[in-house]
Amino acid sequence: MKHTTKAALLADIETTHAALEATLARVPSSQMSAPGVTGEWSVKDILAHIAMWRSRAITQMFKAEQGQPPKMEIPATLAKAANWLDLFNAQEYAAQKDRPLDRVMADFGGSHRQLVKRLRAWGDEAALFDPKRYPALNGR
């Protein structure tokens, strides 16, 4: 595990986010929705993807704070597929690809702020880094 303290994790998140924001500042807004950055995905699509996964992490953290074990909500149509994660990501891409850039950017920034806020408020630092706390996460 890379991080062993909340302070180190938060510092890494903030540093990485600042570097990404600096890179994004150099991308003209006219290019943000252009496909082909990775496969058919645009920069906007990648940011929507990051925001979606951050939001899911925030939800899982909230549940954990309430004493509930983490549970990945997988649509029943995908749950039995060996490549369910790829299928899920493709489904989420399809659902978000036509969203306006300003909404995606708002979600991207908001999900970052909310994740940092939730981590700062997390009370049990030992539990945050205990790979055995939630067996379903396989040590992640």
Where would I find each of the regions flagged by the language model?
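Short, helix-capping/interhelical loops that line the mouth of catalytic, cofactor-
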Residues: 1-8, 56-110
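Short amphipathic alpha-helical segments with heptad-repeat character
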Residues: 10-14, 47, 51, 102-105, ...
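N-proximal short alpha-helices
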Residues: 12, 16-20, 30-31, 77-88
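Alpha-helical bundle segments that constitute or directly flank the non-heme di-iron/ferroxidase center
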Residues: 2-29, 52, 56, 62-63
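Helix-loop segments that flank and shape redox-cofactor active sites
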Residues: 18-44, 63-71, 118-139
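Contiguous hydrophobic segments
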Residues: 1, 53, 109-130
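A general secondary-structure boundary signal
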Residues: 16-17, 21, 100-102, 111-112, ...
